[in-house]
Amino acid sequence: MEESVKPVPKHANHRRSSVRSSLYGDVRDLWSTATMSTANVSVSDVCEDFDEEGKSVRNRIRKYSQTISIRDSLNLEPEEIQQQARRELELCHGRSLEHGEDHEESETSLASSTSESLIFSLWKPHRTYWTEQQNRLPLPLMELMETEVLDILKKALITYRSTIGRNHFMTKELQGYIEGIRKRRNKRLYFLDQ
């Protein structure tokens, strides 16, 4: 008696769990299309992984790349993955501007730059990226939700202070959490205004 085994279709239509989808997120959230929307731009001007003919140069040594391997990115939080993608986008975009100038001068200026200025440039968000992200739906929605969360937490803090006291550890912990959200929000708004 022989049993027939049905092959599993490669593209099975099933809903992914919210945990899995939130872990990896949407690719559209990671990359900006601002530089790709320009007509007649060569791939090498946009990304360092390709030469003038559009061939991959992954086998070459990448001096200043900050990419994370897939194995490392599986252990990161979604916010850390997005931050890493933003840094990589800024580095890639910064190199694309240098290709217009003398290539040797850009290499020597990169080599002579201090590590502090390089670290600062990694943390400063790219203006084009943030402008594009601001025009998309998720950023205003995120700000709206963040405002509502802050309002709810402020009311809870007032209740905690009146009920269990100002010096209770839960009151202090909630107050620290609210201050952390405010600092992150102010930092993001500061970079958006520049």
Swiss-Prot record:
Gene inactivation effect: Mice are normal but males show severe male subfertility. Mutant males display fragmented patterns of CatSper complex stripes in the tails of their sperm, leading to a reduction of calcium ions that pass through the channels to enter the cell. As consequence, the sperm tail is more rigid, preventing it from moving efficiently within the female. Mutant sperm are less able to penetrate the egg than normal sperm.
InterPro entries: CATSPERZ (IPR039019)
Record localization: Cell projection, Cilium, Flagellum membrane
Cysteine disulfide partners in this protein: none
Tissue: Testis-specific. Expressed in adult but not in fetal testis. Not expressed in ovary. Within testis, expression is restricted to spermatids.
Membrane protein topology class: Peripheral membrane protein
A GO cellular component entry from the record: CatSper complex
Highest taxon of the lineage: Eukaryota
Biological process terms in GO annotation: flagellated sperm motility; male meiotic nuclear division; sperm capacitation; spermatogenesis
This protein's UniProt keywords: Cell membrane, Cell projection, Cilium, Differentiation, Flagellum, Membrane, Spermatogenesis
Biological function: Auxiliary component of the CatSper complex, a complex involved in sperm cell hyperactivation. Sperm cell hyperactivation is needed for sperm motility which is essential late in the preparation of sperm for fertilization. Required for a distribution of the CatSper complex in linear quadrilateral nanodomains along the flagellum, maximizing fertilization inside the mammalian female reproductive tract. Together with EFCAB9, associates with the CatSper channel pore and is required for the two-row structure of each single CatSper channel.
Subunit: Component of the CatSper complex or CatSpermasome composed of the core pore-forming members CATSPER1, CATSPER2, CATSPER3 and CATSPER4 as well as auxiliary members CATSPERB, CATSPERG2, CATSPERD, CATSPERE, CATSPERZ, C2CD6/CATSPERT, SLCO6C1, TMEM249, TMEM262 and EFCAB9. HSPA1 may be an additional auxiliary complex member. The core complex members CATSPER1, CATSPER2, CATSPER3 and CATSPER4 form a heterotetrameric channel.
Protein name in UniProt: Cation channel sperm-associated auxiliary subunit zeta
Originating species: Mus musculus (Mouse)
Lineage, uppermost ranks: Eukaryota, Metazoa, Chordata, Craniata, Vertebrata
